[in-house]
A protein has these predicted regions:
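Active-site acid/base region of carbohydrate-active enzymes
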Residues: 297, 356, 363, 367, ...
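C-terminal capping/lid segments that line or modulate ligand- or cofactor-binding pockets
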Residues: 395-402, 587, 605, 649-650, ...
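Extracellular, modular beta-sheet/disulfide-rich ectodomains of secreted and cell-surface proteins
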Residues: 183-268
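Bacterial N-terminal signal peptides
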Residues: 42-53
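Extracellular/oxidizing-compartment recognition motifs
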Residues: 59-185, 268-586, 594, 610-611, ...
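Non-catalytic C-terminal accessory modules of carbohydrate-active enzymes
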Residues: 358, 375-377, 381-407, 432-443, ...
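Alpha-helical support elements that line or immediately flank enzyme active sites
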Residues: 288-297, 302, 469-487, 517, ...
Length: 1004
C-alpha cells in the first residue's frame, strides 16, 4: 500500500499477525516471543512489517491504552476503545495550542485505519476485522498536528482478548460441596459427649446432636449454643461423637468453634477449600493464558506460588445476572514436567463458592488445554468463614493452623487422599471480563501501642481506622490453643459489629495469623487467649482496597484542609472493596446509593472509569424487572434508602460520561434510567410524589445534625416528600442531558417539558408563603428548591438570601445538612460562585463539620456528624471535590466532556495564600497553582495538548492582568473573553501559562 506521503510499505492483512518488539512492555508480556499465535489455531503465518517514517519532531503519541488500561489481558469488548496522549518535545516551555488534526492506527494483521481527520485521541473505536477469543493484538498509532507535522509511530502496545462467546468455554463448573454425596446415607449418632478438656464437667448431648443430623449428614460448628448449654463456662471443651454410617462404625471429635462433619470428607459452604489439578508438560509453553471464573472469592496458585498480588477477587456482581472472569499469563510459572494448578476458594457473598477455569497453552506447535471437570481434587484448608455475612455480623475467619498445608499446590504433593469435586450445572448467566481494578494490599500499618485491658485481654492500637486485616506473629503457643481477635472502630462504648477471627495454633515455635477471605473495619484489635502480651513489632495491619490508579494531587497553605484531603482519600480507600463503594466495611458492607456523593471526589483523585462503569451495570442489573425501580444498594442487598439511592445508577452513568467521554455507558444505561424515573412517577398524585413503601423506602436527607440514629428525631414526612420530589426533578434534567448525548433530542425535549410542568406543582404543594420556606427552615430544603428550579424566578433571590442567612446566622457558619444535602450544597454553592460560604462552612472546627471530626481525632469520616455509630463511612466524602474544582478550579465542561475542554476557575477565599493542584485527565495533566501576596495574585496553569481551556483569573480589571510578563490580551495563545464575577476570563489552548493580577477588594 502507499501511505499519504507516497512512501510504500508492506502491511500484513492475514488473521495471524506480527508482534513488534517492545522492551517497555508490561512484565506479563516480556516473555512472549516475536512470533505470536492464536490459541484457537495451531498454525501460524508470519508477515513482515516495515514502517519508514520521515516525521518532524514536536508531537508523539504516548500512553497507549485499550479499554482504559495499558496492555490489558482478557478484554471482551468486540470493538474496544483505543486511547493515547499527545506529548510535545523540542522546546521549553512546550509549544502552545498544540492539537491533533488526524491519526492513523495500525493493529497488526487486522486493521489499518488510514489517515483519519479527527482531533479524537480518546475512545477511538476499533474498526478492523472481527476479533478472536484469546488472541493477542499489537497496535501503534501516529498523529498529525495543527502545523501539518506527522509524528513518529508510537511505541507498540497490546491487548489480549478474553472469552467472547459462551462456546469458547469448555471448562465445567465445579463445587467442593459433595453434590450427591451431600446425602450421606444412613447416619446414626450412637453417643455424643461435650466435655471440658480438664475434666471440670461433662454433658451427654446425644439427643441434641441426633436432632442436628439432616439427610444423613452432620455438619456443625461446635459450641454451647448449638449443643443446648455450656457445661463448663470459661473452660475449653471438646465434642466427641461415636456414630454408625451406612452400617460402619466410627468416631470423631472437634473443639469449640471448630467444624465437625460426618462424612468427614464433606466440605461445607463456609469452608475455604483447596482445589487442584496436576498435569505434565513436555516443554515450557510459549503462551499460557488462564481464564478463571469464580462466584465467591479465590486465589490462583501454580506450582506452589501465588499468581500475582490480587486478593479477594473477583469483584462482586448480582449473581442472578452475571459473573466475572479474570485472565492471567502463566508462562513464568510453568515448567517442563509435572505441574500443579491450584485454586483456593471461599464463599464471599455466596452460600458456597463455585468455579470454572481453563488454561490454554501452546507447547511447541501443539495447543493444549487444562480445564476444570470432575477429575479435580479438593480438601479443607483449615479455614472457615465465621458469621453469616449479614447486617451487623460480617464475622471473620476461623483458621485451624494444624490443618495448614503450605505444599498443597506443589506438584510433588500427593492428592490421593483428597476428595473429588462435583461438576454442577452451569449458571444461566453470562460471564464477562472484569474491567474494574483488582483488590490488593495498599499499605502496611504497624501497631503503635499495646495495652492490657481490665478483662486481662490485650488491645492493639494501629493509630488509624482502616479496612483490612491483622497480621500477628505468635511465638511458643501450644498446639490447639485458641486465639480470639475482635476488631473495634470505637472503644467507648466498645463497638465491634461482631467482627472477630479465631486462630487455633499449630504449636510451632513461631507462626503467623492473617486473614485471607474476610476483612474488617477497625482501629483496635482485642486479643484473647494469650498468656503474655504480644510484642509490638509482631503486629501489623494491612489496608486493603481497590488498586486505583492515582489521578490527582492537592495541597494548600491550610494544614486543616490538607488533613481533610488526606482523611477523605483514606476514607474512600477504606470503602473500595469488591468492585463498589460500600457505605461502611463492618456493619453492612453494602453498595448503597451513598456512593454517589463521592463521585467527583473519587474521579478527581483516581482513575474511576472501569470501576464506575461496572458499578453502574450493577444498578441496572438490580432494577425491579416489573417496574424498573432501581434498588437502594447494588450489587448486594437489600438495604434501606429512597428514590435518591436508586438514582445512583444514573448519577454514575452521567458522571462517567462527563469525565471520560465514553458514550457506551450512556447507550447501555439510558433506557434503564428512564424506567427508574417512570417507576417513581407511579407514586405521584397531581404531579407530586407521596411517601411510599415502609420506613426505610422513602428516606430523604440522611442523618443531618440532631436528626440521626441516636435520636430517632427524623425529618418529618413532608420533608422527605419534598426532598425526594426535588430529587426526581434533578433526575429528569440529568436524563435529558444524557439523551442529548445520543442524539435523542425529541425524548430530551419531552422530558424537559414534563419537568417544566412539574416544577410549579411541587412548589405549590410545599411552599409556605407565610414562613417563606419549603417544609423546614434548613439548608437542604432551600438548596434543593434552588438547584432543581422549583423556586419561581421571582422568589429565587429571597430563597437564596434565606439559605445564606441559615448558614451565616442560624447555624453560625455551620451546615445542617445530611449526606445528600451536603453533597448538593457543596456542588450548588460552587456552581454559583459562592465559595466564600463553602470556606466558612469547611473551616469550622466545632460541631457539626469536618473540622469537628478532626478535632475529635477522626482518621476517617464518620457516619454522623456527632460520631454516633460507624467511624468509617461514605456519608460526607463529597468534600474533596471542592478542593479540586472549587479552590483549584479544575472542572470538566459538559459541552466537551472528558476534559476535552477544561474550565479553570479557582476560588481565592479566606486566608488561604496558595494552592497547588493537578488532575491527570484522559488527555493529560492539568495543573492549577495559585499564590497570593496581599492583593497580588499569581496563577500558573498547564493545559495538556489536544485540549483547550477557559481560564478565570480573579482580577479587579482585565487591563491589569499579565501573562508571562506581558499584558494578557497581547500574549500568544491567549484571548480575552469577558469580565465575570470579579474575574477576567480567557480562552487558551494547550501549554503553560503564568497569569498575574490584582485581586478585587471582595472575592468569592
Amino acid at each position: 500500500m502507499i501511505d499519504d506521503r507516497g512512501v510504500s510499505h508492506q502491511y500484513a492483512t492475514s488473521e495471524a499477525h506480527v508482534v513488534w518488539n517492545n522492551p517497555s512492555r508490561a512484565p506479563y508480556h516480556t516473555h512472549l516471543p516475536m512470533i505470536h499465535f492464536s490459541r484457537r489455531f495451531a498454525s501460524v503465518v508470519v508477515f513482515a512489517l516495515v514502517f519508514p517514517c520521515f516525521a518532524v519532531a514536536g508531537v508523539l503519541p504516548v500512553g497507549l491504552h485499550c479499554e482504559s488500561a495499558g496492555n490489558p489481558l482478557g478484554i471482551d469488548a468486540q470493538h474496544p476503545n483505543l486511547s493515547w496522549l499527545i506529548e510535545t518535545s523540542g522546546t521549553n516551555p512546550s509549544p502552545r495550542g498544540v492539537k491533533q488534526t488526524a491519526y492513523q492506527i495500525l493493529v497488526a494483521g487486522v486493521w489499518d485505519s488510514g489517515k483519519v481527520a479527527s482531533d479524537q485521541s480518546q475512545n477511538v473505536g476499533y474498526g478492523g476485522k472481527p476479533l478472536v477469543s484469546g488472541q493477542r493484538y499489537d497496535w501503534k498509532v501516529r498523529v498529525w498536528d495543527n502545523s501539518g507535522n506527522v509524528s513518529e509511530w508510537s511505541k507498540p502496545a497490546t491487548w489480549t482478548m478474553g472469552m467472547l462467546k459462551p462456546e469458547d468455554w469448555t471448562a465445567r463448573w465445579i463445587s467442593t460441596q459433595a453434590g450427591a454425596a451431600k446425602t450421606g446415607g444412613k447416619l446414626t449418632i450412637l453417643k455424643a459427649v461435650y466435655k471440658a478438656r480438664d475434666g471440670a464437667a461433662t454433658a451427654d448431648v446425644t439427643a441434641k446432636v441426633s436432632l442436628l443430623v439432616k439427610n444423613g449428614v452432620l455438619d456443625i460448628e461446635v459450641g454451647s449454643g448449638i449443643l443446648g448449654g455450656d457445661p463448663a463456662l470459661n473452660h475449653v471443651k471438646d465434642l466427641a461423637v461415636e456414630y454408625e454410617l451406612n452400617g460402619a462404625r466410627g468416631s470423631t471429635s472437634a473443639g469449640d468453634f471448630e467444624r465437625l462433619a460426618i462424612p468427614k470428607s464433606l466440605l461445607s459452604g463456609t469452608d475455604a477449600p483447596y482445589v487442584r489439578k496436576t498435569f505434565d508438560l513436555t516443554a515450557i509453553p510459549t503462551s499460557a493464558l488462564a481464564t478463571v471464573n469464580v462466584m465467591g472469592f479465590y486465589e490462583l496458585y501454580v506450582n506452589g506460588k501465588k499468581v500475582g498480588p490480587n486478593i479477594l477477587g473477583p469483584a462482586l456482581t448480582n449473581y442472578g445476572k452475571r459473573s466475572l472472569y479474570e485472565t492471567y499469563d502463566l508462562v513464568p510459572y510453568l515448567r517442563k514436567g509435572r505441574n500443579c494448578f491450584g485454586l483456593w476458594l471461599s464463599r464471599g457473598w455466596r452460600d458456597s463458592p463455585i468455579a470454572r477455569m481453563q488454561l490454554d497453552m501452546m507447547v511447541g506447535s501443539r495447543p493444549l488445554r487444562i480445564a476444570t471437570d470432575g477429575e479435580w481434587r479438593c480438601k479443607s484448608s483449615g479455614r472457615t468463614i465465621l458469621g453469616p455475612w449479614q447486617w451487623n455480623n460480617m464475622g471473620g475467619e476461623l483458621v485451624d493452623a494444624r490443618q495448614d498445608d503450605p505444599r498443597w499446590a506443589d506438584p510433588l504433593t500427593s492428592d490421593s487422599d483428597w476428595s473429588p469435586v462435583s461438576e454442577i450445572a452451569a449458571p444461566a448467566i453470562p460471564a464477562e471480563a472484569q474491567k474494574c481494578p483488582p483488590m490488593r494490599v495498599l499499605k502496611t500499618i504497624p501497631a503503635i501501642a499495646c495495652t492490657k485491658r481490665a478483662d486481662g485481654n490485650y488491645q492493639l492500637d494501629f493509630g488509624t481506622q482502616l479496612t483490612g486485616w491483622l497480621k500477628l506473629r505468635l511465638r511458643g503457643q501450644a498446639a490447639g490453643n485458641t486465639i480470639t481477635i475482635e476488631y473495634a472502630d470505637k472503644l467507648e462504648p466498645l463497638q465491634t459489629f461482631s467482627q472477630l477471627d479465631r486462630y487455633i495454633c499449630a504449636g510451632k515455635p513461631a507462626e503467623e495469623f492473617c486473614s485471607k477471605f474476610n476483612y474488617h473495619g477497625f482501629r483496635w484489635a482485642i486479643i484473647k487467649g494469650l498468656a503474655t502480651a504480644p510484642v509490638l513489632a509482631d503486629a501489623e495491619a494491612e489496608l486493603i482496597g481497590a488498586d486505583f490508579e492515582t489521578r490527582g494531587g492537592f495541597t494548600c497553605s491550610s494544614e486543616q484542609l490538607n488533613r481533610m484531603h488526606q482523611v477523605n482519600l483514606w476514607t474512600i480507600q477504606c470503602l473500595s472493596q469488591s468492585g463498589f463503594l460500600s457505605d461502611c466495611p463492618h456493619r453492612e458492607r453494602l453498595g448503597y446509593g451513598d456512593g454517589q456523593v463521592s463521585i467527583e471526589s473519587c474521579m478527581m483523585n483516581f482513575m474511576m472509569q472501569p470501576f464506575y462503569s461496572k458499578w453502574s451495570t450493577d444498578w441496572v442489573d438490580g432494577a425491579d424487572p416489573n417496574t424498573g425501580y432501581m434498588p437502594h444498594t447494588a450489587p448486594n442487598g437489600p438495604g434501606g434508602g429512597g428514590p435518591a439511592w436508586g438514582g445512583a445508577g444514573q448519577a454514575l452513568t452521567w458522571r462517567n460520561y462527563l469525565y471520560y467521554q465514553d458514550t457506551r455507558i450512556v447507550e447501555r444505561n439510558l433506557d434503564a434510567c428512564r424506567r427508574h424515573i417512570e417507576a417513581i412517577e407511579t407514586h405521584a398524585k397531581d404531579g407530586v410524589v407521596r411517601a411510599f413503601g415502609g420506613q426505610w423506602d422513602f428516606i430523604g436527607d440522611w442523618v443531618p445534625p440532631e436528626r440521626g440514629m441516636d435520636t430517632n428525631n427524623w425529618p418529618p414526612k413532608p420533608a422527605a416528600e419534598f426532598f425526594n420530589n426535588c430529587y426526581r426533578l434533578y433526575l429528569r434534567e440529568q436524563w435529558a442531558q444524557m439523551a442529548e448525548v445520543l442524539g435523542r433530542q425529541d425524548e430530551a425535549k419531552a422530558m424537559r417539558t414534563e419537568l417544566a410542568r412539574l416544577q410549579p406543582l411541587v412548589h405549590a404543594a410545599f411552599y409556605d408563603k407565610d414562613k417563606q420556606f419549603y417544609v423546614l427552615d434548613e439548608q437542604s430544603y432551600y438548596l434543593m428548591s434552588l438547584m432543581t428550579g422549583v423556586v419561581p424566578e421571582e422568589l429565587r433571590p429571597a430563597i437564596m438570601k434565606k439559605l445564606e442567612e441559615c448558614i451565616r446566622v442560624t447555624r453560625k457558619g455551620h451546615l445542617d445538612t445530611g449526606m445528600l444535602g451536603t453533597y448538593f450544597l457543596m456542588n450548588y454553592l460552587m456552581e454559583i460562585g459562592r465559595n466564600d460560604l463553602l470556606w466558612l462552612i469547611v473551616t469550622q472546627k466545632d460541631y457539626p463539620g469536618w473540622g469537628y471530626m478532626l478535632e475529635k481525632g477522626a482518621t476517617t469520616w464518620w457516619e454522623q456528624w456527632n460520631g454516633h455509630w460507624s467511624q468509617i463511612h461514605s456519608c460526607f466524602t463529597s468534600l474533596d471535590a471542592w478542593f479540586y474544582q472549587g479552590l483549584a478550579g479544575i472542572r470538566p465542561d459538559t459541552a466537551k466532556p472528558g476534559f476535552k475542554h477544561v474550565i479553570v476557575k479557582p476560588a481565592v477565599v479566606g486566608d488561604l495564600t496558595w494552592v497547588k493542584c493537578h488532575h491527570d485527565s484522559p488527555y493529560g495533566r492539568i495543573i492549577s497553582n495559585w499564590k497570593r501576596e496581599g492583593q497580588q495574585l499569581t496563577m500558573e496553569v498547564t493545559i495538556p495538548p489536544n485540549t483547550t481551556a477557559t481560564v478565570h483569573v480573579p482580577a479587579k480589571v482585565d487591563g491589569a492582568v499579565t501573562e508571562s510578563g506581558k499584558p494578557a490580551a497581547e500574549a500568544k495563545g491567549v484571548k480575552f473573553l469577558r469580565m465575570e464575577h470579579g474575574a477576567a476570563v480567557y480562552a487558551v489552548g494547550s501549554g503553560f501559562y503564568q497569569f498575574q493580577s490584582i485581586l478585587p477588594e471582595t472575592i468569592r
